[in-house]
Amino acid sequence: MSRVCQVTGKRPVTGNNRSHARNATKRRFLPNLQTHRFWVESEKRFVKLRLTAKGMRIIDKKGIDAVLVDIRARGENV
């Protein structure tokens, strides 16, 4: 399962660990992914999404139906 938010599209990015001596070693910054079930009233069923905390806030703002339209427009099965 890839570490990508289904709502925002956020994915891991790379950066550096920095020691006290300022030595740089590569590391990954992972998105804050959560798996969450949402009740979709129009479809009378639950939809399970893998999304970031920011994605949950977007759903709170726009509504699950509007977000599902965007996800399905990208060709994802939900």
UniProtKB/Swiss-Prot annotation:
A single Gene Ontology CC term: cytosolic large ribosomal subunit
GO molecular function: structural constituent of ribosome
Source superkingdom: Bacteria
Cysteine disulfide partners in this protein: none
Family assignment from sequence similarity: Belongs to the bacterial ribosomal protein bL28 family.
Protein name: Large ribosomal subunit protein bL28
GO biological process: translation
SUPFAM superfamilies associated with the record: L28p-like (SSF143800)
Segments for region (Disordered): 1-20
Keywords tagged on the record: Ribonucleoprotein, Ribosomal protein
